[in-house]
Structure formats: structure tokens, C-alpha cells
């Protein structure tokens, strides 16, 4: 293992539990490189939920919190409000983020709280056996849709934009350097940032890892700054980067206003 990664990992916890060829390692390495580009580890907190992606906090040698299913953003919100000077990064799977955690996701977007959400989207529930998820493509066969999925899937990037996130990007596991840059930009951005990483599951989707990466390379195209109505499921890029008032700042302004009023009453 390269020293540039080992210094940021709990090496005693390795090897990971991830299946051979799982793209989660690509995302993990991209995050480490993003942090090395300009952030202090001691001022960065990493939060995760439940699922294959949730194990990322087990391997990172940061201050980490491994939370309950769908509630990673709720925990992260509390951390950020208590310690707004910290960089808070949240790793979630697609099921964790937009199924059981869907309400937390859209309200974090709406509030525009200064968090970075990295959503690893493999289009199914991997840890529990390959079941149907809200992101499973229409027609896809899973353990719980053996004849094909009849539901329309969520487009996570479009959902984030529509709900109010101020930075939204999407890339695939085939573009680790683009993932790195997007996470770096998201951590720099002052507001709620969503970086969706489209991956896949070699085990449950029964695809060779090399073929999965080839699929991601050949079927996705980069289109930056595309309007919400024009974004397609196979588009990747930075779709939104907008300066908006941040939630913690609004809370602090309110707190100061209330304290000022209380002081007047006590005169």
C-alpha cells in the first residue's frame, strides 16, 4: 500500500470487507487525495450510515461516526451546528441516502447546511443481498424484482438540485481524478454539497469489475452546468455551483438577534 494512503487509514482494520472489484475503494482513495489537497485531518469529521459504503468510516483514520440506517445526515447536522468550524463529510449509499434517509436528504438540501454528502450509487442494496432500491433502473432484475423493476428510479443529482443543494456533481467510478476534484470542490464550497458517484456491484449484478468500468466509460458523458430539465441519467459533471446563504450562519444571526433583544429587555 502506498504511504500516501496508509497514513490516512486504520491499517489494522484492513483488508476491507468489500468484495473483490468493489468500486468503494476507488471512492475511498479519491477522498483521501482530496483531503491531502488542502484540508486538515484533525478538523475533518467523517460520518456514514449503514450499508457497504458505511464501512468507510471504519477504515479512515479520522474522527469518524458510524451511525444508524438513513440517519447519517441527521448526525452530521448536529455535529456541524455544534462545531461549525469543522469540515463534515458524509458517506452514504443510494439506499441509505434516498430511501430510508430520503427525508433527511431533501431537508439537508433545502437548508443548505455546510456539509459534503458523497452518495455512492450502485443502484441496489448490496450488503443485504442485492435487493431493489429507489435508484434501480426500470426493467432491471434484482433479488426482489426477478421479472424486472417496474418503478421509475430516482435521479439523485436532479433530486438534490430540485431540493435546493448549492453544489451538485456526478461522476462514475471510472473517473477517480474527477471524483477527487469534485470532493475537494465540495469541501471548499460553503453550503450543502452533493457528489454522486455512480458505481455498480460486481457480486449482485454479476458483472466482471473490468466490464463494469468499461460500461461506465462507454455509457456516460460529461456535460457541465446542464439545466435541471436537461440532465440525463447518463450525464456526469458539475451541474450546479451556486453561492447561497448557509444554514449555520442563519442560525447564528438568529441567535445574536435574540440575545440582543433579551439584553434590551434586561436593561
UniProtKB/Swiss-Prot annotation:
Listed EC numbers: 1.2.7.3
Pfam family membership, one: TPP_enzyme_C
Keyword annotations: Oxidoreductase
Enzyme class, UniProt record, top EC level: oxidoreductase
Matches recorded under Gene3D superfamilies: 3.40.50.970
Superkingdom of this protein's organism: Archaea
Listed GO biological process terms: organic acid metabolic process; sulfur compound biosynthetic process
Record GO terms (molecular function): 2-oxoglutarate synthase activity; thiamine pyrophosphate binding
Catalysed reaction, written as an equation: 2 oxidized [2Fe-2S]-[ferredoxin] + 2-oxoglutarate + CoA = succinyl-CoA + 2 reduced [2Fe-2S]-[ferredoxin] + CO2 + H(+)
Self-association state and partner proteins as the record states: Heterotetramer of the KorA, KorB, KorC and KorD subunits.
Record protein name field: 2-oxoglutarate synthase subunit KorB
Organism: Archaeoglobus fulgidus (strain ATCC 49558 / DSM 4304 / JCM 9628 / NBRC 100126 / VC-16)
Organismal lineage: Archaea, Methanobacteriati, Methanobacteriota, Archaeoglobi, Archaeoglobales
Gene: korB
